[in-house]
Amino acid sequence: MNVNLIHLFFVKNTYRKGLFIMSKRLVAFFSASGTTKKVANMIAEEAKADLFEIESKIPYTKADLDWMNKKSRSSVEMSDKKCRPEIMEKEIDMSSYDEILLGFPIWWYMAPTIINTFLETYDFSGKKIVLFATSGGSGFGNTVKELQSSASDAVITEGSLLNRGTKQEISDWVKSL
């Protein structure tokens, strides 16, 4: 057997109890403006993963997203770490996924609190969660730490800022996982 094929088999599959089982990925994302949604769709296609959109029960308006206004909805939510915006409840069996690629826009150097809502709504026990984000200029900050308490039985790792959203950037990132 070709050595490269063996390597590919070991890298792309999970070994459990003497059997190789294809690991299954889910790309879950929240996008208020459409930027993260575009990136998430490209990641799902490249990773051959299922796609799940995290949607707010009350959609965000342009005024809600005005970070310059301290009374805007996003500013109020981000100033209260206990805030958990309601999400649309959707049926999904998280037990069928090994790895979750979780995407969101960066708000105030971290994930929007709606991501905490998502992590507290579903069971992520034993899951690997890799973060990706879009941002106008800030990085992940303390995002991993802020999210870990919402999914304490999962392993959450900082992935990548995918601001350009080019096919090559996304392809390279997915291959690096």
For the regions a protein language model found, what residue spans apply to each?
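Glycine-rich, N-terminal phosphate-binding loop of Rossmann-like dinucleotide-binding domains
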Residues: 104-105
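Short, glycine-/small-residue-rich phosphate/pyrophosphate-handling segment
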Residues: 130-163
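Short, conserved loop/helix-junction motifs that constitute active-site signature segments
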Residues: 94, 120-126, 150-151
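N-terminal beta1-alpha1-beta2 submodule of the flavodoxin-like/Rossmannoid cofactor-binding fold
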Residues: 7, 11-99, 109-111, 116, ...
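A structural micro-motif
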Residues: 47-49, 127, 154-155
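Acidic catalytic loop of the alpha/beta-hydrolase fold
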Residues: 108-109, 137
